[in-house]
Amino acid sequence: MEYKIEKWEAMDLLAHARDFQTETSEGEIPKFWDEYYANDAYRKIPAYLAVCAQKKTDKNKFRYGIGCKASDIEGVPEGFEILHIPEYTWAVFKCVGPMPNAIQDMWERINKEWLPTSEYERIPDYDLENYLPDDPASQDYVSEICIPVKKEVAEYENETVKNI
């Protein structure tokens, strides 16, 4: 699994967003992308980012948006919102293969393989997916999954030690 750890400054994203049920999101999010591209009003906004808000008020749903950095667009078009992403350290995973299967498979690998064994802990805030303007159905299509992380803190006999 190819990844890198990077520090990013805070940023604002312009997103067309909707709430999704956790249990049905894997099938519903690809439909949301189809709707995004089918609507001419949204063709004016480049869709090279997806953002998933992990701060949940209801554990069974989350907010997911499609869009771009707000600095790339003037104003906020109807149907869009600005999402402020704080400064974080990010784990950035390279994903290769056709969408949506490649990105869904990589999420599964991150959650089952990387997170349980890495020295990093996921910060439950915003996750990002970066998409290139190439053909997303291509076998060699490249995208990225970016999750905010921090070094895990280990406890030893009533003493807290921060991993460096």
Name each region found by the language model.
Residues M1-I164:
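A solvent-exposed interaction/effector surface
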